[in-house]
């Protein structure tokens, strides 16, 4: 696990861009993408660069159940706003949260991942150590699955909605085993509210109580942290 401690979001974006460039130089063609505030600075740097993704494939981590693709809080909308409208891919895959049969959708999505192994996966981490929508207690062997969001995650996401009642209670998420198949992983965290989760996933035991802790077992992980998120680490 390689740690990169940065002083600003702009610096984080440049670090992320550098990792994308290196991956492409090494032959990467399939990129696993994430949503939320954490990757925005990286996406900003990428979309302002000269990188061309028109021959590549993107596969997103997750999507809420029940939100239309054009809903401002859907992850389809997010990705179009921050990435795809500026840097399109040959194919962009995202879970279909509107599917009539979500169970079939999860199997279909696993097939997509199987046919398009991810070269570089972007991740954020939740305050409780979740990655994607894989909440504490999720099996490390999990594939793409339907998730019942925890009260903490619903509360954290409520800032994006007019009221907490509008926050979706379920999502479709790539599983932890699916994520771990990626050849390379870039995970980022910023702010003091992430410091405890960062300490636990980097220095704590590998446990399903902290889903991100499984990344200790992955052969190629880069962690981008600001000073606040890294504050509780004993080794930096």
Curated annotation (Swiss-Prot):
GO cellular component: cytoplasm
Coiled coil: none
Catalytic activity as recorded in UniProt: alpha-D-glucosamine 6-phosphate + H2O = beta-D-fructose 6-phosphate + NH4(+)
Gene3D superfamilies for the chain: 3.40.50.1360
InterPro entries cross-referenced by the UniProt entry: Glc/Gal-6P_isomerase (IPR006148), Glucosamine6P_isomerase (IPR004547), Glucosamine6P_isomerase_CS (IPR018321), NagB/RpiA_transferase-like (IPR037171)
Pathways involved: Amino-sugar metabolism; N-acetylneuraminate degradation; D-fructose 6-phosphate from N-acetylneuraminate: step 5/5
PROSITE patterns listed in its UniProt record: GLC_GALNAC_ISOMERASE
GO BP term (any one): N-acetylneuraminate catabolic process
Keywords: Carbohydrate metabolism, Hydrolase
Source organism, top-level taxon: Bacteria
Signal peptide: none
Active-site residues annotated for this sequence: 62, 128, 130, 135
EC number, UniProt record: 3.5.99.6
Family statement: Belongs to the glucosamine/galactosamine-6-phosphate isomerase family. NagB subfamily.
UniProt protein name: Glucosamine-6-phosphate deaminase
Source organism of this protein record: Oenococcus oeni (strain ATCC BAA-331 / PSU-1)
Gene: nagB
């Amino acid at each position: 696990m390689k740690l990169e401690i940065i002083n600003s979001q702009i610096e984080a974006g440049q670090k992320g861009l550098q990792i994308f460039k290196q991956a492409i130089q090494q032959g990467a063609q399939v990129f696993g993408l994430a949503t939320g505030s954490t990757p925005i600075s990286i996406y900003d740097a990428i979309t302002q660069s000269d990188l061309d993704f028109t021959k590549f494939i993107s596969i997103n981590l997750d999507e809420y159940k029940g939100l239309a693709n054009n809903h401002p809080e859907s992850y389809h909308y997010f990705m179009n706003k921050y990435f795809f409208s500026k840097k399109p891919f040959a194919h962009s895959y995202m879970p279909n949260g509107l599917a009539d049969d979500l169970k079939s959708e999860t199997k279909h999505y696993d097939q997509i991942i199987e046919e398009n192994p991810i070269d570089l996966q972007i991740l954020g981490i939740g305050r409780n150590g979740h990655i994607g929508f894989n909440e504490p207690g999720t099996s490390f062997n999990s594939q793409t699955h339907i998730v019942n969001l925890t009260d903490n995650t619903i509360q954290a996401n409520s800032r994006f909605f007019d009221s907490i009642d509008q926050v979706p209670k379920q999502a479709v998420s790539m599983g932890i085993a699916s994520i771990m198949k990626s050849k390379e992983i870039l995970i980022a965290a910023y702010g003091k509210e992430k410091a405890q989760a960062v300490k636990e996933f980097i220095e704590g035991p590998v446990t399903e109580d902290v889903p991100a802790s499984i990344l200790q077992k992955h052969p190629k992980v880069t962690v981008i942290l600001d000073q606040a998120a890294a504050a509780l680490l004993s080794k930096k």
